[in-house]
């Protein structure tokens, strides 16, 4: 798992985090849906946000007016190809619209960065997932069957990989939906830190 220390905000790449990155890369490579499950507090959400650089991306796409689009972007935005989304307590169709909107905003910032910084001509794709290769859905446990159907729809139509993050047991629940379950290629259990790693991290923090 990844550990974030509040004081220095330094993310420590643990073995679990590295395993999670490999899992994400495998899902992208084979365009599969993957399930990641683990107990609360082991670092699932933190790792997904670190992998997607989401705290940074979120600021980039949080523009209010059109003239703000891409103003603060740097070349990192062109590498942003993962959407991180926390499962909401809203209607399934609204959820789809929200995910579409995130993809659209990321595409818009990339386009404007290319125009403003690289002198490219303005052109905007109608496919909001054109430069997205992975969608991570956190807290999948909260979703009803209608939401899962919508996610399957996005997966089938948009040619992107997906990862569902949830509690242990989520893989058994998803097995009840054969149409969705048949598309799941990988499962990844997110473990707690080993005693050795905790010791190593504490030593590392102590030295700072």
Task: Outline where the language-model segments fall.
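Pre-Walker A adenine-sensing motif
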Residues: 15-28
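Walker A/P-loop nucleotide-binding motif
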Residues: 31-52
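A short hydrophobic beta-strand->loop->alpha-helix junction that borders the nucleotide-binding pocket
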Residues: 65-70, 80-91
């Amino acid at each position: 798992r990844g550990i974030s220390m509040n004081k220095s905000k330094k993310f420590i790449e643990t073995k679990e985090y590295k395993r999670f990155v490999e899992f994400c890369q495998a899902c992208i490579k084979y365009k599969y849906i993957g399930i990641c499950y683990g107990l609360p507090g082991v670092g699932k959400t933190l790792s997904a946000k670190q992998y997607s650089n989401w705290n940074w991306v979120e600021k980039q796409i949080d523009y209010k007016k059109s003239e703000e689009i891409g103003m603060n972007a740097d070349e990192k935005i062109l590498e942003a190809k993962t959407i991180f989304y926390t499962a909401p307590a809203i209607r399934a169709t609204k959820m789809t619209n929200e995910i579409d909107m995130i993809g659209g905003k990321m595409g818009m910032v990339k386009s404007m960065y290319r125009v403003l910084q690289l002198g490219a001509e303005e052109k905007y794709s109608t496919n909001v997932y054109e430069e997205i290769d992975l969608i991570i859905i956190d807290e999948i446990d909260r979703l009803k069957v209608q939401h899962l159907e919508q996610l399957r729809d996005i997966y089938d139509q948009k040619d992107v990989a997906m990862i569902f993050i949830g509690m242990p047991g989520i893989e058994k629940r998803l097995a009840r939906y054969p149409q969705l379950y048949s598309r799941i290629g990988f499962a990844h259990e997110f473990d707690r830190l080993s005693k050795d790693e905790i010791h190593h991290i504490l030593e590392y923090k102590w030295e700072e």
